[in-house]
Amino acid sequence: MSTQIIFLFGRPGVGKLTVGELLSADTGYRLLHNHAVVDLVTSLFSFGSPPFVALREKLWLDAIDACITAKQSGVIMTFAPESTVTDEFIPTLKKRVTARRGALRFIELRCDDAQLETRLTAESRGKFGKLRDVNQFRQLDKDGAFDRPKMPAAELVVDTTGRDPLESAQLIANHLRQAGVNPRRRRKSS
């Protein structure tokens, strides 16, 4: 079976990392966390600068290429659309995954604005360089910062508002199994 790239995307605060970690535990797929790449690149270049944008996208693409080459069964990549991502990134990712006979599956997480703003201030977001300022989020949102790049239609949309993250991860895992992907089920430890 081809390497499955589960592209878990949504606005800041919808629960991508939490759901991604739980989905990884359930499926056995590796997790490529957006901020692992972003934090590395911001240690070298200012966020949004041309070298930052170029290196971040190169690392994302090279990481996915390496997983496909290594015949990993699956990779969960978390992603937040935002204005410093080039419009070419998603089409380039699709072409590269397809050329290597991988499968790219877009799964969107959503959350209502009130809960999203509550989540943004969570202490756990400080572990990575995640957006935690509600006023900054509102301004960025008003300015359209999260409206690009244009995302393809998701094959599954999960509303995480008021939903336990484990339930969200299980919805995704069950969707993948029903689609014939059949990731392994998490083994319970004794």
Model-derived segments and spans:
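Hydrophobic anchor at the beta1->P-loop junction of P-loop NTPases
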Residues: L8
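Small-molecule kinase domains that catalyze NTP-dependent phosphoryl transfer to phosphate-bearing small molecules
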Residues: T118, A122-L171, N182-R185, S190
